[in-house]
């Protein structure tokens, strides 16, 4: 809201919000992750879709899904360890979005979060819940120091959390630009984190510095009298949303009251069918021919 009050664009506000989420919801969102962004320019009647999803390191091969004996690793096992981490695209995407649609100066977007990280923010209830899991901070000394007390118990909800390292990182990016996050040595810490322990990553500094943000054609389809546009693959959420909406449109006589068993049943079945399709047909279009338009036709 502060960005809009200062004359900024919706993109300025979105970037400032993302930076703040990296502080107060760091378990779910941050500079080490990936982002999709869709932007509608009402004046130009133009829709832009940017893909900043985390991607596999350049050295990745299919053999990384197998164990030392050649057997297929369990799906749950592949989701743990440094090998499961993708090359982050959030910051490159934010920089590209700002270059295209931002109005305020880049450093201005960082001020609220730098201030909150330096002065402290109250421990959110959801972060507390996540950190309370038995293995949440195991072997992570930095997390223990930041979010836990001397008895290694999660600090109570509402406790003031100060994160000077995040503030320092944001100050560097604000003053020197997005590439500063890797130029100032953060890449060393990031790579050390994903290259140690269980199933280490093959990620390199070159992967981090050469991340390619892609502009993709949005995926659009009809819903009643509307035209709904969503993020195209590799995002699978858009395909699911359009499929569900179009199946519901065929049953529009049922209304939209979730308290009615008939509608609730149709909605649940539509979701099941859409999820089945996305699991079977939707993947990274760089490696797999995705029949996206056919799926929402």
Residue ranges of predicted features:
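Noncatalytic scaffold domains of N-terminal-nucleophile
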Residues: 2-6, 10-183, 188-232, 236, ...
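Short helix-capping/linker segments at secondary-structure and domain boundaries
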Residues: 99-104, 175-178, 248-255, 278-282
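Internal maturation/activation junctions in enzymes
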Residues: 142, 250-297
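Flexible, polar/acidic helix-loop-strand segments at domain edges
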Residues: 239
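Protein kinase glycine-rich loop
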Residues: 243
């Amino acid at each position: 809201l502060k960005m809009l009050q200062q004359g900024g664009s919706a993109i300025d506000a979105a970037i400032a919000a993302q930076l703040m989420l990296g502080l107060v919801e760091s378990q779910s969102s941050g500079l080490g992750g990936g982002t999709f962004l869709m932007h509608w320019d009402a004046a130009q009647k133009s829709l832009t879709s940017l893909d900043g999803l985390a991607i596999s390191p350049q050295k990745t091969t299919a053999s990384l899904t197998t164990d030392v004996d050649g057997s297929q690793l369990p799906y749950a096992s592949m989701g743990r360890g440094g090998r499961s981490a993708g090359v982050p695209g959030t910051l490159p995407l934010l920089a590209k979005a700002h270059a295209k649609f931002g109005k305020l100066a880049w450093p201005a977007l960082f001020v609220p979060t730098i201030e909150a990280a330096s002065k402290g923010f109250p421990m959110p209830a959801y972060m507390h819940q996540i950190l309370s899991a038995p293995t949440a901070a195991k072997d992570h000394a930095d997390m223990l120091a930041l979010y836990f007390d001397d008895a290694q118990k999660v600090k109570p909800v509402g406790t003031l959390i100060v994160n000077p390292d995040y503030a320092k990182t944001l100050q560097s990016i604000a003053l020197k630009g997005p590439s500063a996050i890797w130029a100032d040595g953060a890449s060393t810490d990031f790579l050390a984190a994903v290259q140690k322990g269980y199933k280490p990553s093959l990620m390199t500094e070159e992967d981090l510095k050469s991340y390619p943000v892609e502009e993709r054609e949005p995926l659009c389809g009809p819903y009643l009298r509307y035209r709904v546009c969503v993020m195209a693959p590799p995002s699978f959420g858009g395909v699911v949303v359009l499929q569900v909406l179009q199946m519901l449109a065929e049953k529009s006589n049922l209304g939209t009251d979730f308290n009615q068993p008939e509608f609730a049943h149709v909605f649940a079945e539509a979701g099941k069918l859409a999820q089945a399709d996305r699991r079977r047909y939707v993947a990274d279009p760089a490696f797999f021919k995705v029949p996206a338009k056919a799926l929402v036709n």
